[in-house]
């Protein structure tokens, strides 16, 4: 399986994402610059965290116009796994690949610390390695992680089981309905504010994020013929 890690000007979690795939999973991965216009050679696309284009206007507002985003949309439409973490989630929202919007944290401060999440839906290509209701520890690092959508959209998210992760216990940023991560209706585009790529080694505090990346690989292997 081959992963693409998209790098925008200002991305700063791309190396962590690369490490999770290459060193922890042993899968093939490649950095892709923001002006790339073809992602057909990849099986999954990862949009890392950071401060793309300095977060000017809004987080992700400029990055969504990058040349690579047309290729990201094409990958999503083809059913390939697309994961956006933190700033990557914000970019997916701005690009219309996921519903809703992101606001400043309720306390108007940047928050960087581990949080607990509840796995709300374990029947997705991103969460099959988890148990339903499993509580996991994943770090956050954001100033604009307060997810919001209108009432009708929230009803659809709940009805379609598109809410994949919720904050467990304390809600750190005021996010609507404690939402920490959602998928699109097709189930192949996931956006989440916590950083699973920073939770792949127990020595560093948690390895709970590794199951997310393993879920993607397991899904791909189950749906593709792998030859030696």
From Swiss-Prot:
Transmembrane segments: none annotated. PROSITE patterns: GATASE_TYPE_1. One of its GO terms (molecular function) is ATP binding. Pathway: Purine metabolism; IMP biosynthesis via de novo pathway; 5-amino-1-(5-phospho-D-ribosyl)imidazole from N(2)-formyl-N(1)-(5-phospho-D-ribosyl)glycinamide: step 1/2. It is found in: Cytoplasm. One of its GO terms (cellular component) is cytoplasm. It comes from the Bacteria. Keywords: ATP-binding, Cytoplasm, Glutamine amidotransferase, Hydrolase, Ligase, Nucleotide-binding, Purine biosynthesis. GO terms for biological process: 'de novo' IMP biosynthetic process. Residues 4-226 form the Glutamine amidotransferase type-1 domain. It catalyses: N(2)-formyl-N(1)-(5-phospho-beta-D-ribosyl)glycinamide + L-glutamine + ATP + H2O = 2-formamido-N(1)-(5-O-phospho-beta-D-ribosyl)acetamidine + L-glutamate + ADP + phosphate + H(+); L-glutamine + H2O = L-glutamate + NH4(+). The keyword Ligase applies. The active site is at 86 (nucleophile), 195, 197. The keyword ATP-binding applies. InterPro entries: Class_I_gatase-like, PRibForGlyAmidine_synth_PurQ. Pfam families: GATase_5. Its EC number is 6.3.5.3, 3.5.1.2. Part of the phosphoribosylformylglycinamidine synthase complex involved in the purines biosynthetic pathway. Catalyzes the ATP-dependent conversion of formylglycinamide ribonucleotide (FGAR) and glutamine to yield formylglycinamidine ribonucleotide (FGAM) and glutamate. The FGAM synthase complex is composed of three subunits. PurQ produces an ammonia molecule by converting glutamine to glutamate. PurL transfers the ammonia molecule to FGAR to form FGAM in an ATP-dependent manner. NCBIfam families: FGAM_synth_I, PRK03619.1. Part of the FGAM synthase complex composed of 1 PurL, 1 PurQ and 2 PurS subunits. This is Phosphoribosylformylglycinamidine synthase subunit PurQ. It comes from Geobacillus kaustophilus (strain HTA426). The lineage of its organism: Bacteria, Bacillati, Bacillota, Bacilli, Bacillales. The gene is purQ.
């Amino acid at each position: 399986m081959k992963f693409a890690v998209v790098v925008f000007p200002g991305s700063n979690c791309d190396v962590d994402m690369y490490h999770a795939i290459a060193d922890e999973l042993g899968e093939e991965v490649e950095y892709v610059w923001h002006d790339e216009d073809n992602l057909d050679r990849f099986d999954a696309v990862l949009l890392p965290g950071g401060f793309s284009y300095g977060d000017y206007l809004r987080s992700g507002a400029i990055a969504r116009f990058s040349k690579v985003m047309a290729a990201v949309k094409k990958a999503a439409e083809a059913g390939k796994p697309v994961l956006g973490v933190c700033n990557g989630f914000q970019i997916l929202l701005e690009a219309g690949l996921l519903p809703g919007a992101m606001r400043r944290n309720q306390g108007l401060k940047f928050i960087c610390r581990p949080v607990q999440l509840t796995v709300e839906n374990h029947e997705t290509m991103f969460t099959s390695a988890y148990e339903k209701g499993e509580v996991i520890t994943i770090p956050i690092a954001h100033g604009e992680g307060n997810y919001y959508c209108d009432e009708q959209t929230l009803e659809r998210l709940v009805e379609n089981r598109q809410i994949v992760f919720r904050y467990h216990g304390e809600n750190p940023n005021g996010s609507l309905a404690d939402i920490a991560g959602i998928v699109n209706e097709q189930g192949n585009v996931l956006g989440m504010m916590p950083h699973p790529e920073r939770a792949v080694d127990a020595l560093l505090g948690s390895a709970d994020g590794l199951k997310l990346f393993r879920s993607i690989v397991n899904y791909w292997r189950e749906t593709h013929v792998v030859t030696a």
